[in-house]
Amino acid sequence: MQGPSLSQLVLVLMGALLEAGTPREEVSSTPALPREPRTGTEGLIFHWDWNWPPPGAWPPGGPQDPLCLVTLNGTPGNGSSPFLWVVGTLSSYEQAFLEAVRHARWGPQDLANFGLCPPSLRQAALPLLQQLQAWLGEPRGQRLVVLHLEEVSWEPTPLLKFQEPLPGEASPLELALLVLYPGPGPEVTVTGAGLPGAQSLCPTRDSGFLALAVDRPERAWRGSGLALTLRRRGNGASLSTAQLQALLFGADSRCFTRMTPALLLLPPQGPVPMPAHGRVDSMPFPQPRLSPEPEEPLPSTDPFLETLTRLVRALRGPPARIPPPSLALDPGALAGFPQGQVNLSDPAALERLLNSEEPLLLLLPPPTAVTAGVPAPLQGPVTEMWASSLARRVATEFQSAAAELRGFPGLPPTATLLLARLLALCPGDRGDPGGPLRAVLLLKALQGLRTEWRWRERSGPARAQRSAGTAVSNGPCALRELSVDLRAERSVLIPETYQANNCQGTCGWPQSDRNPRYGNHVVLLLKMQARGAALARPPCCVPTAYAGKLLISLSEERISAHHVPNMVATECGCR
């Protein structure tokens, strides 16, 4: 009997590889626990005559998995299951979970299937499961957001980090459920910063799912992730890493892999596409602006102030959309600072301001001190000294600061025109009592902008290093994300990259509650530094706590998995 030809064998092998699909990006912090297999379209019903939105209707930078219309069992139109809008990938694991919730009657068998403890104990997840069941029966156009696990670390406590949802899909929420697919393990009590108190899980041999209620789901994709603390019910003993992995990430014997958790979010009802006569009346997404500009301020009656505002925004960038924080001033604290009244018409006071490039804080009187909303006039006439020698010096300072600003590379093209207009508007008419105030405002603004752009010029290489994750941040000492590439380590097979984190920021006095574990030694050093004492090594931001990492490596022609301590920075502090 003649065997298959070589070309047929090659085609068969290529077909097998194509059926296997392209492997998805692995979870960097779970090398021994790969993600679930690629999901086919089994159980996802796509009707042939549905008019889906074109690819351009989805916002750029959105998730790889668009909004899908699915059903759970049955075909559309036969009344067996309503249409469900799902944002994200609905794998076979989540599909089985939704099927189980839909058909549950919440008897003892169903409680055991979801790992719920006896009804005598308070179950935070049970009302949410029943609410999800009601949504599956009558979706009312609401979308179900499915977030998959991106990263996990096991020590000192499990930290689960999930995908970040689209803007507007995570706040506010009607429901947030953490769904786990368990393996063998004991009954446990689970606590965590994102959970509404302690919750009990009672898995049995018949348990296919575990569900935890989440009241602050944003912790699942911000920072280091959702922290879970599991202890045995009764004696409160902690579980080992192997026990945690076996319980939380059950094994899928058919695919030789582990089943990773998912976070299900149910935002409130909103306007969504609705089917009608085999068509979809789609509501396209608004095209996002790449560089959102702030709302233009109300036109000012003073062209000088309007031009100065435009110059500052052009050189410093648009302000944030959040409202500016109010400056709470403590009168007792202000009493300790050098202060005094400054007469802006006094040449000596203006000369002191000219000699200093420090920022200027102007405290305006409260609205009650101004009669009928009319600004109080400046006191004191404009002297001849201001009109002669001091005015020339102010003009010289203006021209010097403006010339230096024009010479900085990367200056916006509108800055030169705004500078020329400001110099023409200031100090104004000789008889204008606001001339000295305008001169001070313009001078301090130009000095501040010049100082900032000088710093940008000097720290250009440092910013390039900071983009690579090697420079120190200007904020307070805190934990920053840092990805480490292990591909240069030839002995390490998995993971290729992982989130190691790093500590960056400044150490100053007083220490804040960001780093509550500071010691007396660093407090004394920071106080000495604040008094101007020279220190050979000033306090710096360093990791103060670490977690281990599971690595799969190749050594002497053997593949081994071992736990390496102190691989992930979990806390930072000044030392």
Swiss-Prot record:
Keywords for this protein:
Differentiation, Disulfide bond, Glycoprotein, Gonadal differentiation, Growth factor, Secreted, Signal
Note the SS bond partners.
477-541, 503-572, 507-574
* Glycan-linked positions: 78, 343
Q: Supply the residue numbers of the propeptide(s) excised during maturation.
A: 21-466
Residue numbers marked as site, Cleavage: 466-467
- Give a brief account of the tissues where this protein occurs: Detected in fetal Sertoli cells. Expressed in granulosa cells of growing follicles but also in theca cells of preovulatory follicles and corpora lutea (at protein level).
For this record, the Gene Ontology CC terms, alphabetical, are: extracellular space
What modifications does the entry list under PTM / processing? Answer: Preproprotein is proteolytically processed to generate N- and C-terminal cleavage products that homodimerize and associate to form a biologically active non-covalent complex. Binding of the non-covalent complex to AMHR2 induces dissociation of the pro-region from the mature C-terminal dimer. The N-terminal portion of the protein, despite having no intrinsic activity, has the role of amplifying the activity of the C-terminus.
Q: Which InterPro entries match?
A: AMH_N, Cystine-knot_cytokine, Muellerian-inhibiting_factor, TGF-b_C, TGFb_CS
**Family, similarity comment:** Belongs to the TGF-beta family.
Q: Which PANTHER family match?
A: MUELLERIAN-INHIBITING FACTOR
Can you name this protein? Muellerian-inhibiting factor
Naturally occurring in which organism (per UniProt) = Sus scrofa
